[in-house]
A protein has these predicted regions:
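Glycine-rich "HGGG/HGxG" loop immediately N-terminal to the catalytic nucleophile
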Residues: 128-144
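Structural recognition of the beta-strand scaffold that forms the well-ordered cores
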Residues: 91-93, 121-124, 178-180, 202-205, ...
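Small-residue-rich helix-loop
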Residues: 352-404
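Alpha/beta-hydrolase
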Residues: 188-365, 369, 373
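Alpha/beta-hydrolase active-site loop
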Residues: 145-168
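Alpha/beta-hydrolase active-site loop signature
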Residues: 98, 127-130, 210, 226
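Catalytic-loop region of hydrolases
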Residues: 6-120, 131
């Protein structure tokens, strides 16, 4: 039997760790830095050693209407080796915008405390991500099929899954459920507790930007947080990154300049046009953002193999005044900390950031249409090119809004 005191102990422990994590991980409002970047997912499999079983549960495509009776299979991962079958708690991870196996293998806190609290671990995949995609590939070509990608529908999926598990797993009927999540998954965990209090006794929402919406949070907050992660190491580091945008713009205007950029940064693809330069700048923006996010005080393979305090390592190359090609060479050395710390990369691919593309199609629709957050474009010490603000919805997300009309 798990007492209320034990559950409170989970929250006390988690709050302390969450506060530390928020401080170390560039703090934050977590990590929706520009029009494309979202919670990252590794391109490599995570060999965590965690043991779990994979199951599928038949879900309704539409929980709130009567016209659509279609169903899909929702994937969920279950680990019961630590569980007390006499009412031990259920720790339920509210899946993010990506493959649930990656989150399962990178949420060590849940695994660490499962043994202490004798908990059943459940990791539920979010609809339209990973393997849990209603209508398959057609979902991303037909707006009528994609219409059911909402947080409300996902929360209803989680609620139905929990009810199913508690009714079919012997000993689970009286088990208290605690929701866990980070980033968008943390938002879902918090909303899950709010919307379904009879199902979830509490939620631990790590780095969840539940207040990062218009009229609540200043739109400059995110970049200010990312900037501070670099500024703590060196003011000159921030100045050099800020100066680099105009330098890249200048080189990107000519064929010779674009060729030089490709050579200096050892890019796998040529920069043939201004659109390629824009992709290159997006890639750099995501790099600085991801570095701030994984600025842990210990070595990690979370996104890429990285040293402890990777922002500090990057800023070692950007802490002295530099101009023109000298600054470009320093930038290359800095981003190589992220992309080539092992020294095994022969070239750098601007179409990858140490994150998989499994969730990109769903998130590129979901975020601008359903989760319009204030975005940080104007902060003076920015790590993004200010010109991107003008293009944000015109070239990036505007086409998605047509789908919502």
């Amino acid at each position: 039997h798990v007492t209320g005191m034990a559950i409170r102990k989970v929250f006390s422990l988690a709050v302390g760790i969450s506060v530390l994590c928020l401080f170390l991980c560039a703090s934050s409002s977590k990590l929706k830095s520009n029009k494309k970047w979202h919670f990252p997912r590794a391109t490599r499999k995570a060999f965590s050693g965690y043991i779990y079983k994979t199951y599928y549960f038949k879900q309704q495509v539409d929980h709130f209407g009567f016209a659509n009776v279609d169903t899909f299979l929702q994937r969920y991962l279950l680990a019961d080796q630590y569980w007390n079958h006499n009412g031990g708690p259920i720790f339920f991870y509210t899946g993010n915008e990506g493959d649930i196996s990656w989150f399962c293998n990178n949420t060590g806190f849940m695994w660490d405390i499962a043994t202490e609290f004798k908990a059943l671990l459940v990791f539920a995949e979010h609809r339209y991500y990973g393997e849990s995609i209603p209508y398959g590939p057609e979902a991303f070509t037909n707006p009528m099929k994609l219409n059911y990608l909402t947080s409300e529908q996902a929360l209803a999926d989680f609620a139905d899954l929990i009810n199913y598990l508690k009714s079919t797993i012997p000993g689970a009927a009286q088990s208290p459920v605690v929701a866990f999540g980070g980033s968008y998954g943390g938002m879902l965990a918090a909303w899950f507790r709010m919307k379904y209090p009879s199902i979830v006794v509490g939620a631990l929402a790590g780095s969840a930007p539940i207040l990062q919406f218009s009229g609540i949070t200043d739109c400059e907050v995110f970049n200010e947080v990312v900037t501070r992660a670099f500024e703590r190491e060196s003011v000159e580091c921030v100045s050099n990154i800020r100066a680099s945008w105009q330098l890249i713009n200048n080189y990107g205007m000519t064929d010779a300049g674009r060729k030089l950029l490709q050579e200096v940064f050892h890019l796998c693809q040529p920069l043939n046009a201004s659109s390629d330069v824009d992709t290159f700048k997006d890639w750099l923006t995501g790099t600085w953002t991801n570095l701030a996010m994984v600025n842990y005080p210990y070595p990690t393979n979370f996104l890429e193999p990285l040293p402890a305090w990777p922002v500090r390592e990057c800023c070692k190359y950007l802490s002295n005044p530099a101009e023109s090609q000298g600054l470009l060479l320093d930038l290359f050395a800095a981003i190589s900390v992220y992309y080539n710390y092992t020294g095994q990369a022969s070239c750098l691919d601007i179409n990858q950031q140490g994150t998989s593309s499994l969730g990109d199609m769903g998130w590129d629709y979901q975020k601008p249409v359903l989760m319009v957050e204030e975005e940080p474009w104007k902060t003076p010490a920015r790590t993004t090119d200010p010109r991107e603000a003008i293009e944000l919805y015109r070239d990036g997300d505007a086409h998605v809004f047509k789908w919502s009309e």
